[in-house]
Amino acid sequence: MINRKILLTSLLLIFTVLSACSREKNTCRVVKISDGDTLTCLTKGNKSIKVRLAEIDAPEKSQAFGQKSKKTLSDLVYQKNVRLARKGKDRYQRTLAVVYYQKQNINLEMVKQGMAWAYKQYSHDPIYLQAQENAQAKGIGLWADNNPIEPSQWRRQEKINMAFDYQTFPSSISLFPT
């Protein structure tokens, strides 16, 4: 009986220590806002982490509502200690995470305020789509625009525009030499 109590107490202590270490590892201070869905934070050991907010896609900086989205994220978390619920890495090796400030889901808050879309391609939680539908119905944030363009569509169009701009292509250069 005593051995069992010692074992249970030991296991409880180990899990408590591991939990505390995990919380500390996932806590950081936001030191930079890149745009409405990307931030940089520092851990207690001064390790820099670039974080891409999971489940959402915010307008690009040069897109309509891009600067407002960036400012909204800044107002919510800049210079604040946040907790990261990590989801892995994206193709640019940024940490994908749900960001929490004082138990508030910041990713979800960005969608609620109409400053980001639920990222349908990568979203696994229906609360983001519900929040988007609510913001859209109320005309909040980017939903006040007559024709809001999803960032993924906007990026595709920008690539096409940059790939070949007939307006600026020099007329002295022949595309089809004879």
Swiss-Prot record:
Enzyme class: hydrolase
EC number(s) given by UniProt: 3.1.-.-
Residues forming the catalytic site: R52, E60, R94
Keyword Hydrolase attached: yes
Cystine pairings recorded for this chain: none
UniProt GO MF annotations: endonuclease activity; nucleic acid binding
Record keywords, A-Z: Endonuclease, Hydrolase, Nuclease, Signal
Residues spanning the signal sequence: 1-19
Pfam name, any one: SNase
PANTHER family on file: EBNA2 BINDING PROTEIN P100 (PTHR12302), SERINE_THREONINE-PROTEIN KINASE 31 (PTHR12302:SF3)
Family: Belongs to the thermonuclease family.
Stated name of the protein: Uncharacterized endonuclease HI_1296
